[in-house]
Amino acid sequence: MVIITILLILFQLNKVFADNIQLPDSHAPISVMGDHTHKKKEVMFSYRFMNMQMGKLFNNNKKLSKDAVMSAPNGASDGSGSYMNTPKSMSMDMHMFGMMYAPSNRITLMLMNSFLEKEMTQQRMRMAGGANFDVNSSGFGDLKASALITLLNETNWENSFLLGVSLPTGSIDKRGRTPASNNTRLGYGMQNGTGTYDTYFLINNLNTIDKFKIGEQIHF
C-alpha cells in the first residue's frame, strides 16, 4: 500500500509540472539537415554518426538475384561480356562534421563534410569459383557549402530555403585488393566522392499549432 501511495504521488507531481516542461523542439530530428537558422553572429558545430547496412540488389523496384546480375550484359565491354562479380552486402559508417555561422539574422552559412568507412563483400562468378572476397575504403567525402535564408519568422510560422553546392573533394580513385589484382580501382559505390560539382536546393516549413509543431522539408 505504501508503494502504491508513493507511485500515485509521483504521478500527481508529474501532472502538476507537465505544463512547464521544456521540449527540445527547436531542431528537427538529427537525420534532417539544414532545418534551422541562427541569430546574427551565432556559431554552431555539429557531429552526426550514421551506419548503413545494405544486402539486396534492385533494378528500379524489381529485386535481382546474384545470378541475374552476373549474367547481365556488361556495358564496359559493349554488351559482349558479363559481370565477373556481384555485391552481396555492404556496410558504411559515416561521421558527419558540420559548422553553421550566421552573418545576419536572415542568412546562415553552412559547411559539411563526412568521413566514410566502407566495406563490401562480393561474390565471384561460378566459372571463377564463386568465392567471396571483401574490399574496403575510407576517407573524406565531398565538401558541401550552402546558405540557409529565412523567408518568414513569425510566432506560429517559420519558412526558409537553402541553396547549396557540393564540391568534388572526395577521392574517386580508391584502390584495393581483388582476385583480379592487388591494386584494382574499386567500384563507384566504394569511392568517397562523386567527381562532379552538384547543386541542391531545399525548402523548410514549420507550423506551430497550440502545443504541436508540424514541419516539412522538400529537396530539389
Each predicted region: which residue ranges?
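Generic cytosolic/nucleocytoplasmic N-terminal low-complexity/intrinsically disordered segments
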Residues: 13-14, 143, 210
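Cleavable N-terminal export/targeting peptides
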Residues: 1-26
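Short, glycine/charged-enriched secondary-structure capping and boundary segments
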Residues: 125-126, 176-178
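Aromatic-anchored, glycine/proline-accented short structural segments
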Residues: 197-220
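Short, surface-exposed, charged loop/turn segments at secondary-structure junctions
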Residues: 177-183, 220
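Transmembrane beta-barrel domains of Gram-negative outer membranes and organellar outer membranes
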Residues: 19-158, 164-167, 185-193, 198-201
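A short secondary-structure junction signal
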Residues: 172-177, 215-217
